[in-house]
Amino acid sequence: MRPSLSDYQHVASGKVRELYRVDDEHLLFVATDRISAFDFVLDTPIPDKGRILTAMSVFFFGLLTVPNHLAGPPDDPRIPEEVLGRALLVRRLDMLPVECVARGYLTGSGLLDYQRTGAVCGHVLPQGLGEASRLDPPLFTPATKADIGEHDMNVDFAAVVGLVGAVRANQLRDETIKIYTRAAAHALHKGIILADTKFEFGVDIEGNLVLADEVFTPDSSRYWDAAHYQPGVVQDSFDKQFVRNWLTGPESGWDRASDTPPPPLPDEVAVATRERYIEAYERISGLSFSDWIGPSA
């Protein structure tokens, strides 16, 4: 269910977000409480999730010294009260058709690719790596953007060059690794491993590359507790991997290979996911989520 905002025209729906036109130069970027996994949007919302994602993005946009799409503070008067705390006023950009993924550790689809081919997105890796093996230096492992209900596809660097040209592809790779490295160092200082993350970039009217969408949220990143990190096993996480693990476990009764929609989440899984998202935000930012603006779920 999307917010009905009478003052603004709805222009697009994503898996988790809704986009509204503010004027010719600005959009309203609204994070809902929907959650997606394995490229499906689940039936069960996670209470306050949209506010947590927005709070985390605002924190990291402030921490990072790179151009981004924000066009005002999270309490900008142009943001309607009913979406306060889960919406951002952003600049219109020409978005690039690439998911820019940085991997500092081997897990998820990267691990599956490695187990099948010995490589990840064209990066040939040493033998003997396993779940949660550290990758030094971090890898740029891009993917194509998928529509709702379709699957993102990992691609190699040559495919990115084919999509956006060599100059822009090199820029995307370099910026992705630079931004990830900065954020990973910050998270580790707070006792959390930033295992991987994904970005989206756009281009402004002057041709400048701009960081857009969400950044370093528990939706777009994998966060692990550094104190309990152990290579070779699935890590306890502060992100939606918790939901993925339940869906692929015996309790859900769901067969991922069937390509049928996943079942609803039990209340206890939704509540635990909310708690993990909040813990990630509070530990990394040093702020209390109870102080974040907007109505709580």
Curated annotation (Swiss-Prot):
The organism's place on the tree of life at top rank: Bacteria
InterPro entries hit by this protein: SAICAR_synt/ADE2_N, SAICAR_synth, SAICAR_synthetase_CS
Family to which this protein belongs: Belongs to the SAICAR synthetase family.
Protein name: Phosphoribosylaminoimidazole-succinocarboxamide synthase
Keywords: ATP-binding, Ligase, Nucleotide-binding, Purine biosynthesis
Gene Ontology cellular component terms for the protein in this record: cytoplasm
Enzyme class: ligase
Keyword Ubl conjugation assigned: no
The keyword Iron is annotated on this UniProt entry: no
EC id: 6.3.2.6
GO biological process terms held by the UniProt record: 'de novo' IMP biosynthetic process
Catalytic reactions of this protein: 5-amino-1-(5-phospho-D-ribosyl)imidazole-4-carboxylate + L-aspartate + ATP = (2S)-2-[5-amino-1-(5-phospho-beta-D-ribosyl)imidazole-4-carboxamido]succinate + ADP + phosphate + 2 H(+)
Gene Ontology MF terms in the entry: ATP binding; phosphoribosylaminoimidazolesuccinocarboxamide synthase activity
Species of origin: Mycobacteroides abscessus (strain ATCC 19977 / DSM 44196 / CCUG 20993 / CIP 104536 / JCM 13569 / NCTC 13031 / TMC 1543 / L948)
Pfam families reported for this sequence: SAICAR_synt (PF01259)
Annotated metabolic or biological route of this protein: Purine metabolism; IMP biosynthesis via de novo pathway; 5-amino-1-(5-phospho-D-ribosyl)imidazole-4-carboxamide from 5-amino-1-(5-phospho-D-ribosyl)imidazole-4-carboxylate: step 1/2
